[in-house]
Amino acid sequence: MKINKYNSLVFAVLFGFGLSGQAQTKQWTLEECVRYALDNNITIKLSELDVKNAVIDKRGALGNFLPSVNANASHSWNVGLNQNITTGLLQNSTTQYSSVGASVGVDIYKGLQNQNTLRRTKLAIIASQYQLTKMQEDISLNVANAFLEILFNKENLKVKKEQLAIDQKRLARSEEMVNAGTIPRGDLYDLKATAATDQQAIIVAENSVLISKLSLAQLLQLKEFTDFDVIDDTDIKDENNIMAQTPIDIYNKAKETRTELKLAQTNLEIAERNVIIAKGAFQPTLSAFYNFNTRASYSDIITGSTLNTANPTRQIGYVEGTNQAVLEPNYSPVLGGAAPIFDQFNDNKGQSFGLQLSVPIFNGFSVRNNVEKSKVSLERSKIDLEQKSLDLQRNVYTAFTDAKGALNAYESSTVTLEARQQAYNYAKEKYDVGLMNSFDFTQAQTLLTNAQSEVIRTKYDYIFKIKILEFYFGIPIIPIITK
């Protein structure tokens, strides 16, 4: 089942690229591939959004220095037995009230937390930019690796096709020699088997080319990749003379330029700032406030009074000694409509302002725990920076050793290829005059093909290892890797 799925994938890739055979294929250079990836890769776009978030956080930190201003308004209905605030009487009625207000508050002192928070957000912007740069560098290396993989597979396919062409010519000549009785028919069968093996090797090599193209196209986030191809613009020469540097020189340069160290150092500074912010919560806070409010009622108001004709007097007491009733005129209030709302707002307005001091005494160890947690994070950041430095040193020395080994392997493979070519030429001369059988000649040919493939492999392996070493030395894959 797994084999069938793999074959289906290969067929789909072959079909997709095959349809474009008649179209004009664009050949991409390494620089074009890297720049396109930097502009379109999803991971890089996410890192760019992180930078934008960090900038927004900085604006929020600046806002902490500004006063907070809030306005409020309300309108309410009271239904049922309520006291009329105008007459003071209890009555069943529906009354309405409106109120508006505003408040202003500003922090005067908050343990310098606002200042330190602003400094932290500035560091966070730098850290997010370093993270974006690191992502760009990683994508550049991945693109370069995938690009060189395509070049290797294309060169390998070229060797396989050239070998098939040679075998087909030799097969045609061998048929003539068999017909002439110069060589036995068994040699002809061996050559046919060799040609068939060459055909199979070409199919495998073509699949490798197409799959490597697909891998790079996906890395570039290409929506249409059927016409995708690359052109070899690489050079085996060490143009920057990087191999003349010592590992310690490369490491010292890397400590100055490598983004992962800058990012770890910035994260350490952020952790230090977090400790200071957490300690600021131990200090008292002082703030100022100002409040304004006013209200209005929609109830009727007393506009005057009139004598109650039904009960013109009312008793208010007795004369001591005679118990004579003391009476006064009984007036009833005359109610009018509610006062104009804006007049009420103007008459009923009130203000309050002052200072508020808050001294932390005990908060369930929350402040102390936050300080301890921030200190743990600080220690973690210190260890991370130290680990990043050790990793960088190991990676530089490993990259230098790999590049040196790749160069030696490439030089050795070229010497081997030269020897295999001479051995093949000698075997061909002997085979052509009947002094060597087809089996031994095929062995010489196979060794030559393997030597050619090894030269190609070591060539592109060396180019990539040099790219990595230059990368640690501060030389980017392309001149400018940022947008």
Question: At which residue positions do the language-model features occur?
Answer:
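Membrane-spanning beta-strand positions in outer-membrane beta-barrel proteins
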Residues: 43, 68-70, 113, 204, ...
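Bacterial Sec-dependent N-terminal signal peptides
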Residues: 1-31, 41, 477-483
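Membrane-embedded beta-strand positions in outer-membrane beta-barrel channels/transporters
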Residues: 101-103, 147, 251, 354-356, ...
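Sec/SRP-type N-terminal targeting helices
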Residues: 45-49, 62, 94, 108-136, ...
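Short segments within alpha-helical structural elements
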Residues: 49, 200-222, 411-475
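Periplasmic alpha-helical coiled-coil/stalk elements that build and connect Gram-negative outer-membrane
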Residues: 2-3, 56, 138-256, 402, ...
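Bacterial Sec-pathway N-terminal export signals of envelope proteins
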Residues: 23-74, 80, 224, 231-272, ...
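Small/polar, glycine/serine/threonine/aspartate-rich low-complexity segments that form flexible
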Residues: 25, 72-106, 234-242, 289-359, ...
